[in-house]
Regions:
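Alpha-helical scaffold domains
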Residues: 1-225
């Protein structure tokens, strides 16, 4: 597995653009080190390794993801996310809670969390509802706000299948946290629902007395009365 990750890193290094590093790192608030590889070339590299990666068993899949996550370069971590998005539905297991928690709470920023939350966690929650209920309780009780953001946005892809009662519960639970990424997530989750249930969104905004960023984002697509 180490050789595979090394091979991927070497492939990324061959297409890196050092002139982009400063801009890419600044965009992520200098939280991560970048090689300077844009998404297009990175995805081409992933495609070259995709066939090999898709043959991995569940335990080996997580081993690969963990090794990518331990790499110093963000683009290697992005490859792990590319892999999750492409294949998680095929290797998902009811015991994945610990691994998902690790990915969501380490090397964390919106660029990684939002994709994992809305795709991988969203799938885990529907495929293993009993296990997710236990996991969600742990996340709710955690002091890690990124896990709270995950609970707020994991239903983004559900559309009309969104559990509205559950969404409002999490909004009510976390709305007092003025952290930007929480308020943004509240508004984002409601904005998605407003595309098909705008009156419900208006009701929630009033009932929960949402203000500022959360309110603006929630009502972005809702016609004014």
């Amino acid at each position: 597995m180490h050789e595979l990750v090394q091979d991927i890193q070497h492939s990324l290094e061959r297409v890196k653009d050092p002139t982009r590093v400063e801009q890419m790192e600044a965009y992520m608030k200098n939280n991560f080190s970048f090689l300077g590889v844009m998404s297009g070339p990175r995805k081409e590299i992933f495609q070259k390794h995709k066939a090999q990666l898709l043959q991995l068993k569940p335990s080996a899949s997580w081993e690969f993801i963990y090794e990518c996550w331990a790499n110093q370069y963000r683009e290697v971590q992005y490859i792990a996310i590319d892999f999750l998005l492409a294949n998680y539905k095929k290797f998902a297991q009811p015991s994945d809670g610990t691994a998902l928690t690790f990915i969501l709470s380490n090397q964390t920023w919106w660029d990684s969390l939002d994709l994992v939350a809305s795709h991988s966690v969203g799938h885990f929650a529907t495929k293993f509802p009993t296990e997710f209920k236990v996991l969600a309780q742990e996340w709710e009780e955690s002091e890690h706000f990124w896990l709270h953001r995950t609970l707020l946005i994991h239903q983004l892809k559900y559309k009309q299948k969104t559990n509205l009662d559950l969404l409002q519960y999490y909004i009510r639970t976390f709305k007092s946290n003025k952290e930007f990424f929480i308020q943004k997530a509240i508004g984002w989750s409601l904005r998605e629902v407003s595309k098909w249930k705008p009156i419900w969104v208006q009701k929630v905004v009033l009932e929960e007395n949402l203000q500022g960023l959360a309110k603006r984002e929630a009502l972005k697509y809702v016609p004014e009365a």
